[in-house]
Every structure is written in structure tokens, then in C-alpha cells.
Design a protein with these regions (language model features):
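Small-residue (GG/TT-enriched) beta-loop-alpha framework at ligand/catalytic clefts
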Residues: 8, 13-22, 29-30, 37, ...
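Active-site neighborhood for divalent-cation/phosphate handling
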Residues: 24, 30-61, 71-167
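Short acidic, S/G/P-rich loop/turn micro-motifs used as interaction or catalytic elements
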Residues: 18-19, 40, 92-94, 235-238
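Hydrophobic beta-strand segments of well-ordered beta-sheets in folded domains
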Residues: 10, 79-86, 177, 225-233
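Short, surface-exposed loop/strand segments
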Residues: 1-7
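Glycine-rich phosphate-binding loops at beta-strand->alpha-helix junctions
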Residues: 229-243
């Protein structure tokens, strides 16, 4: 007997250091399963992903009781998880929705991010802040995913972060600079009247590096001592940073 997919979704989050899997438990209703794979250094992200998929206990489930049907042709795809929503951590290019052009998006992105010339470019609307987020998806990464899942939906890792920061930017008369720390990097955002005012990313291995970039952006935006600095994420040396 062969099986058809159960139209279930698995969420895959790919960062520089980890790959995580989140999915509804196929046996216990209402329970969510979570699994993390640590990236191996020295091999490509796509190779890490292939290994993570092979080792993932969530994906090793071969059936979902009571939800499988017979089909005439064997399927190459996973028998339980029909769709994968994949969050990727590649540089963002935020394009105002009113200026977005799907045909010119790849050219604009590759011009701004020269290290991703060979990658595909995806665009995801973020309606809450009226932009389209352009970001890179490696061809090898896409191939590995489409081998296993019938439907693959890509999303930028920072999309929900942007929406939450924009929501928190309202209220009060002070300007706010938001800093999100992760994977030895800090992403900085500023908003005004629900629109993105500033968006950039900086490599930060040491606390003094983070302090330098934050102060530089603060001064560039003309922010005052009475304005608000918001820090989030995995912050190394937080006490030293706040001195």
C-alpha cells in the first residue's frame, strides 16, 4: 500500500548555527513537536539540511493514523507532511510596496548583496509595514527541500521580528531604535508612522563592535538621549553593552 500526503505543515527554521523543525504531533492532538539540529562547520548549508532531514525524528514518522489513502503511483514526497514553511536567514532588501516590481527585484537584490549573485531571489509581502521583503534562497537548498516536500513556502526569518518591532514603535513621542541580536550579528530597525525608516545588519563578534554600530546608527538617525533603545535576542555581554 502507498500513501498520499496528509496536508500537514512542518516549519523549518534555518539560521547560521542551527536548523529547527516544528510540527503538530501526528498522534497526540494539540501537541507540538520540536527538534533542533546543530550546523556542522566546513560543509554547505544545503548539505547540513540534507543531513538534518535524514536524522529528524519528526520526519521519520511514516504514517498518520486514519488519514492515509491509497494511491496508484508511489510518491517521492513525505507521506505525512505535505508542506514545509521554511524560514531562511539571508540579508533582506525592503522594497516599498508601491514601488515593487517583480521583474526588477532580483537585479536590485543582487546589486545590493553581491555575495548572493548565484542564489534565487524570493519576495514576501509584509503588509503590516507596507513593504515587500526580498531575500536570497540558495538553489541547492531549494532542491533539497523540493525533493522531500510537495509544497515549499519560503519566508524571511526576520519578517515576524519586523512586524513585532513596528507594533512596539507606536506610542509616546520618543523615537525608538530596535536591535535584534543573533548568530554574531545585530539587525537594526527604526520606524516612523508605521513605515520603515532604517534597516541594516552588522557582524558583531565582540561587545565593543555592537556598541560602535549602535552608536553610529543612533547618531546617523539624529536620535536624542531621551529616545529609546530596544534590545532583543541573544545578547552577549549585555551588562558591558549597557554601560
Amino acid at each position: 500500500m502507498t500513501t498520499t500526503p496528509c496536508n500537514m505543515n512542518i516549519t523549518i527554521r534555518i539560521t547560521r548555527s542551527t536548523i529547527t523543525f516544528t510540527a503538530p504531533n501526528t498522534v497526540i492532538e494539540g501537541q507540538t513537536d520540536f527538534e533542533q539540529y546543530n550546523m556542522k562547520t566546513g560543509i554547505a548549508v544545503a548539505a547540513n539540511l540534507r543531513q538534518a532531514l535524514a536524522e529528524c525524528h519528526i520526519l521519520k514518522a511514516q504514517s498518520a493514523p486514519g488519514r492515509l489513502q491509497e494511491q496508484a503511483v508511489p510518491s517521492q514526497y513525505h507521506p505525512v507532511f505535505d508542506t514545509a514553511t521554511v524560514f531562511v536567514d539571508t540579508p533582506l532588501l525592503l522594497i516599498p510596496a508601491e514601488e515593487f516590481d517583480a521583474e526588477t527585484m532580483p537585479q536590485l537584490y543582487h546589486y545590493a548583496n553581491t555575495k548572493h549573485q548565484q542564489d534565487d531571489v524570493e519576495g514576501t509581502p509584509i503588509n503590516q509595514i507596507n513593504v515587500v521583503a526580498a531575500y536570497a534562497v540558495g538553489k541547492d537548498l531549494r532542491f533539497v527541500l523540493t525533493e522531500m516536500f510537495r509544497n515549499v513556502k519560503f519566508m524571511p526569518l526576520l519578517a515576524p521580528i519586523l512586524v513585532e518591532f513596528c507594533r512596539r514603535s507606536y506610542g509616546g513621542f520618543q523615537e525608538k531604535l530596535f536591535c535584534y541580536f543573533h548568530d554574531k550579528r545585530v539587525d537594526m530597525f527604526a520606524f516612523r508612522k508605521g513605515r520603515v525608516r532604517f534597516c541594516s545588519s552588522f557582524e558583531v563578534s565582540l561587545t565593543p563592535d555592537a556598541a560602535y554600530f549602535i552608536l553610529n546608527v543612533w547618531q546617523t538617525l539624529g536620535m536624542k538621549p531621551s529616545d529609546v533603545l530596544c534590545l532583543a535576542g541573544s545578547i552577549t555581554g549585555q551588562e558591558a553593552l549597557l554601560k
